[in-house]
């Protein structure tokens, strides 16, 4: 009995010493836990409900993610999740895209000027006045309008196949150029394949190394939205208006020369619409570029997202 009491006392002493041990400094270091929760919100902008995805701490540097055609904020789902530990990320859907309101083309002017004005007002209402932009496809004409209107607000540009040069217009524009020359039933009809499920799938898989690595949810979501009444009319209006972006290229190039914004290029070189020549052209106006070319297509994040997100993280820390 005496031995049992001694053993019990010894065990209690060992436990007490263990509890009083100084904590390992490695264990007490603060950790960067990923804030992977993405919030799905809406904001009324001049009578239009703008849907947007948001993640990360608003006290961290902000990156505004501007999507392309035919997509929505959905194209940035990986970025919103993976980079939210160090950055505040916000990705709006343009009017007529994603989960935002889709006013009829008879009631709403679908031009890049008008869409950019809504995104500018959206950021104003969100009180976001210092931010980097990530641009892709349609995100470039939206983003460069924001940048030229308020250059002091732009902290950096992350460019994934967002064009600003005539040299960057590829073979994929031939049908749309015919629409610019003469918009009629024939030139519109020639573009309708783009809105089919097969045409949308092609946009995501053309130029990729492994098409089977591209999530089919991307083009299936876009196709469902293409089935809405007047959706084709809305997109044809924007195709037709794209020629006005080209007229603004000199203005955007001057912005780049005058302001020399930090620029990260992460470009899919096999893009039929914006080939690598579009990426190369930025070297004419920006002195220092973090320049990265990928052997993939129009939506480089789909196939090379992990490396691109690593590049974004490194670039934004410089």
Segments and roles (model prediction):
Residues 70-78, 89:
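Serine-hydrolase catalytic-loop signature spanning alpha/beta hydrolases and amidase-signature enzymes
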Residues 68-71, 137:
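Active-site glycine-rich loops that stabilize anionic/oxyanionic intermediates
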Residues 29-50, 55-58, 62, 90, ...:
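Flexible "cap/lid" subdomain of the alpha/beta-hydrolase fold that forms the substrate-access gate
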Residues 17-18:
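C-terminal motif of bacterial Sec signal peptides marking the signal peptidase cleavage site
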Residues 21-31:
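Bacterial Sec signal peptide processing site at the extreme N-terminus
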């Amino acid at each position: 009995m005496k031995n049992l009491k001694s053993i019990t006392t010894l065990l209690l002493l060992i436990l007490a010493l263990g509890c009083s041990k100084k904590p390992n400094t490695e264990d007490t270091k603060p950790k960067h836990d990923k804030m992977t929760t993405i919030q799905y919100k809406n904001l009324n902008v001049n009578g239009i409900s703008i849907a947007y995805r948001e993640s990360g701490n608003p006290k961290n540097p902000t990156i505004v993610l501007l999507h392309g055609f035919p997509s929505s904020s959905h194209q940035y789902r990986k970025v919103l999740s993976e980079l939210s530990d160090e950055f505040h990320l916000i990705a709006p859907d343009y009017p007529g895209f994603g989960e935002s309101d889709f006013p009829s083309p008879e009631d709403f002017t679908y031009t890049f000027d008008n869409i950019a004005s809504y995104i500018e007002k959206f950021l104003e209402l969100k009180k976001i006045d210092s931010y980097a932009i990530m641009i892709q496809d349609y995100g470039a004409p939206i983003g460069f309008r924001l940048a030229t209107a308020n250059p002091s607000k732009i902290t950096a540009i992350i460019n994934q196949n967002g064009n600003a040069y005539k040299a960057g217009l590829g073979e994929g524009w031939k049908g749309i150029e015919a629409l610019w020359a003469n918009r009629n039933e024939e030139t519109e009809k020639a573009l309708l394949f783009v809105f089919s499920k097969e045409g949308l799938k092609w946009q995501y898989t053309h130029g990729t190394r492994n098409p089977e690595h591209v999530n089919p949810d991307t083009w299936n979501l876009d196709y469902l939205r293409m089935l809405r009444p007047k959706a084709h009319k809305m997109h044809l209006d924007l195709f037709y208006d794209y020629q006005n972006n080209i007229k603004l290229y000199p203005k955007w190039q001057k912005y780049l020369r005058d302001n020399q914004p930090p620029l990260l290029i992460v470009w899919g070189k096999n893009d039929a619409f914006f080939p690598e020549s579009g990426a190369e052209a930025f070297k004419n106006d920006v002195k220092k570029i973090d320049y990265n070319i990928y052997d993939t297509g129009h939506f480089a994040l789909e196939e090379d997202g992990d490396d691109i997100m690593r590049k974004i993280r490194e670039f934004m820390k410089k």
